[in-house]
């Protein structure tokens, strides 16, 4: 199957098509999981002929269990119908690659990044290194600021936890100073 030919039906840029194909093949190889195929020989499907098509398809697995699946009453993915049909007709690693290609093509058309590794993340640096020297408690034994608070025991919501401060330099632990309320 010529994947490049399939991509070219949806994407005009040669460079973008090459990048997308490489990304899809890499991800399909990494995250490929075997799809468990229903091996039951007899699957009876009953289609309801209702006055109002509510979009539910009824399928009967065996005589004891019933399962319901949503069946869209409005055809979706008309723009990508050929690619969706290819996904249905293939299996294995090709199917996974085509699924990634479909996702990537939709992202390219929507002008969003398809590679999660390139999506900019939030800057969490403000949440780390919160225990600076100015905000840490001074050790009662060696007067060092290299201390860290530790919760030893948590209680119910109406009681405060047992907290001790441990000095990393001398190894002593002590109770934190109490705040006085007027």
From Swiss-Prot:
A zinc finger (TFIIS-type) spans 135-175. One of its GO terms (biological process) is DNA-templated transcription. GO terms for molecular function: DNA binding; DNA-directed RNA polymerase activity; zinc ion binding. Keywords: DNA-directed RNA polymerase, Metal-binding, Nucleotidyltransferase, Transcription, Transferase, Zinc, Zinc-finger. The keyword Zinc applies. Gene3D superfamilies: 2.20.25.10. It catalyses: RNA(n) + a ribonucleoside 5'-triphosphate = RNA(n+1) + diphosphate. InterPro entries: RNA_pol_30_chordopoxvir-type (IPR009162), RNA_pol_30_chordopoxvir-type_N (IPR024394), Znf_TFIIS (IPR001222). Zn(2+) binds at residues 139, 142, 167, 170. Its EC number is 2.7.7.6. Transmembrane segments: none annotated. The keyword Zinc-finger applies. It comes from the Viruses. DNA-dependent RNA polymerase catalyzes the transcription of DNA into RNA using the four ribonucleoside triphosphates as substrates. Rpo30 may have a role in RNA chain elongation. This enzyme consists of at least eight subunits. This is DNA-directed RNA polymerase 30 kDa polypeptide. The lineage of its organism: Viruses, Varidnaviria, Bamfordvirae, Nucleocytoviricota, Pokkesviricetes. The gene is RPO30.
